[in-house]
Amino acid sequence: MAVVTMRQLLDSGVHFGHQTRRWNPKMKRFILTERSGSYIIDLQQSLTYIDKTYDFVRETVAHGGTILFVGTKKQAQQAIAEQATRVGQPYVNQRWLGGLLTNFQTVSKRLARMKELEELDFEGTTSGFTKKELLIKKRELDKLHKSLGGIRNLSKTPSALWVVDTKKEHLAIDEAKKLGIPVIAILDTNCDPDEVQYPIPGNDDAIRSVSLLTHIVADAAAEGLIQRHQKPEEGVEAAEPLAEWEQELLAQPAAEVQASAETEKAADADLAEAKADSAAVVAEGEAAADAVAETPAE
């Protein structure tokens, strides 16, 4: 069953690349054509890479791994927070803290400090602190929530990163590379594919494109959680037990995965037709490019 259809990718503008003057020559193999001064990404390749990414994320989470969702640009912040929270994965949608991966021990201390401050009674008089002291601590807590709130349950370095805009998140990419952590990312036409182990050629600037692809990665994580929760087959080593907060999340992702599966069944005919005739897909993509109102990324 298809993870996503060609129509969904077209409707979300995943095929729109940057202007031809802003590109990375290494991305040439992922480009279908040029139209109105901008590149059009080959969605046939995007579909193939999406399937590979989906399988990797599902298996990683099923075996006890964690996917860190990273996207600090405005177009990605909401989708990153919503989808990561939906499947109980950590996320960073504000400023990336230097050393978050390479100096995780220090970050863990800041997380412990945040949880310590959360225990204080800021409204009552039982804390033993003056109003001024409480105000200072409240401001400290708010700052920690903003920068670390998305990784509060991260107890060790993640198994992989999902990144929106590899150029903007170059610090996260560099730290992951130093530690040998696989990177899954959207590759726009100005990106360097050599930095990413699991690329998805696509538009990393449009909100709809970012939301769709992030939702797909979250669905894969949800399916992995469900598999981890199921009884392992005889002779297969059991995965790490689910934490309580993960168990609470299982019901919602399971329902959403089922609903998504039912929706995809109805669209499988369109996908089969698109794959059977690549020329028709190209024509459809160019027609959609004229019809879509969204302006290509600059």
UniProtKB/Swiss-Prot annotation:
Keyword check for Ribosomal protein: yes
Recorded superkingdom: Bacteria
Cross-referenced InterPro entries: Ribosomal_uS2, Ribosomal_uS2_bac/mit/plastid, Ribosomal_uS2_CS, Ribosomal_uS2_flav_dom_sf
Entry GO MF terms: structural constituent of ribosome
One GO CC annotation: cytosolic small ribosomal subunit
SUPFAM superfamilies: Ribosomal protein S2
Keywords: Ribonucleoprotein, Ribosomal protein
Pfam families, per database record: Ribosomal_S2
Keyword Ribonucleoprotein: yes
NCBIfam families: rpsB_bact
Family label: Belongs to the universal ribosomal protein uS2 family.
The name this protein goes by in its record: Small ribosomal subunit protein uS2
Organism from which the protein derives: Leifsonia xyli subsp. xyli (strain CTCB07)
